[in-house]
Amino acid sequence: MSTIVIDYQTESIPDDWLYPAEWRIQRWLDCALTVLAIDEALEVTIRLVDNDEITELNAEYRGKNAPTNVLSFPCDWDLPEEPRLLGDIVIAVQIVNQEAKAQKKKMEQHWAHMTIHGLLHLLDYDHIEEKEAQIMEDLERTILAQLGFPDPYCA
């Protein structure tokens, strides 16, 4: 059975902002690893940020001077110890909450989707090419269905 250790960084987020409890993040990632049949000890950092910080990161690492919902930074160090460090998932709290409201989705559903989306990027899935996007979206649908959430791509 896989295990995932989470370093959940929420220090820079005001107390009155809405975001999921760490146990929910843990549940979503555990489910994803089970569906993906990954059987190793892993570690991931989940960092929650505001629009300014996500915009800076998006500009620096993707050349896009605009906010985005989630960024993933895979760890490229080949470290021998366990758990294996996968990398960082950076989530923009305001963006994710605004998207959920605009798309008329439950907050928990959209947060689960964005968290799983970020994890899949750390595991080397991508959506640049249409074929890759279909594979990634199908995995997201499967994992979210296991968690009891509807298809995130249906209106």
Swiss-Prot record:
Pfam families, per database record: YbeY
Chain segments annotated as transmembrane: none
Localization: Cytoplasm
Cofactor note: Binds 1 zinc ion.
Gene3D superfamilies listed in its UniProt record: Metalloproteases ('zincins'), catalytic domain (3.40.390.30)
Keyword annotations from UniProtKB, A to Z: Cytoplasm, Endonuclease, Hydrolase, Metal-binding, Nuclease, Ribosome biogenesis, rRNA processing, Zinc
Cysteines joined through disulfide linkages: none
Binding positions (Zn(2+)): H117, H121, H127
Classification via PANTHER family: ENDORIBONUCLEASE YBEY, CHLOROPLASTIC (PTHR46986:SF1)
Family per record: Belongs to the endoribonuclease YbeY family.
Protein name: Endoribonuclease YbeY
Organism: Dichelobacter nodosus (strain VCS1703A)
